Amino acid sequence: MNNLLLVALGGSIGAVFRYLISIFMIQVFGSSFPFGTLLVNVLGSFLMGVIYALGQMSHISPEFKALIGVGLLGALTTFSTFSNETLLLMQEGDWLKAALNVVLNLSLCLFMVYLGQQLVFSRI
């Protein structure tokens, strides 16, 4: 299958997952903090770490990378929404939540990429 079609397929799945997760998180926690965006970014970072490590250990096809790495995870995670939500919190004068959003997204996402890699590498 053409890699472009695989990216589109993965992207459509990732976008639907992001939407459903965001709606669920709003229903559970309300909308005063962007928990949905945080969750999809953290989850996507973990999965990206796993995929990267698997690629280092064995051959992962370009098609799989296009479908999952670029398509699904690219659409699941969202830096632009994170940036917009952080700016909105700042514009509302909620500097603490804005700072918390930045710190949590960056630190948790970096840690989850690392954790995903380590879980795969430790199983060698």
Swiss-Prot record:
Membrane topology: Multi-pass membrane protein
Regulation: Na(+) is not transported, but it plays an essential structural role and its presence is essential for fluoride channel function.
Binding site for Na(+): G74, T77
Catalytic reaction annotation: fluoride(in) = fluoride(out)
Pfam families given in the database record: CRCB
Molecular function terms from GO: fluoride channel activity; fluoride transmembrane transporter activity; metal ion binding
Alphabetical list of InterPro entries matching this protein: FluC (IPR003691)
Gene that this sequence comes from: fluC
Family: Belongs to the fluoride channel Fluc/FEX (TC 1.A.43) family.
Chief place of localization: membrane
A Gene Ontology term for the protein's cellular component: plasma membrane
Biological process annotations from GO: cellular detoxification of fluoride; fluoride transmembrane transport
Subcellular location, record wording: Cell inner membrane
Keywords from the UniProt entry: Cell inner membrane, Cell membrane, Ion channel, Ion transport, Membrane, Metal-binding, Sodium, Transmembrane, Transmembrane helix, Transport
Transmembrane annotation, as ranges: 4-24, 35-55, 60-80, 102-122
Protein name, entry field: Fluoride-specific ion channel FluC
Biological role: Fluoride-specific ion channel. Important for reducing fluoride concentration in the cell, thus reducing its toxicity.
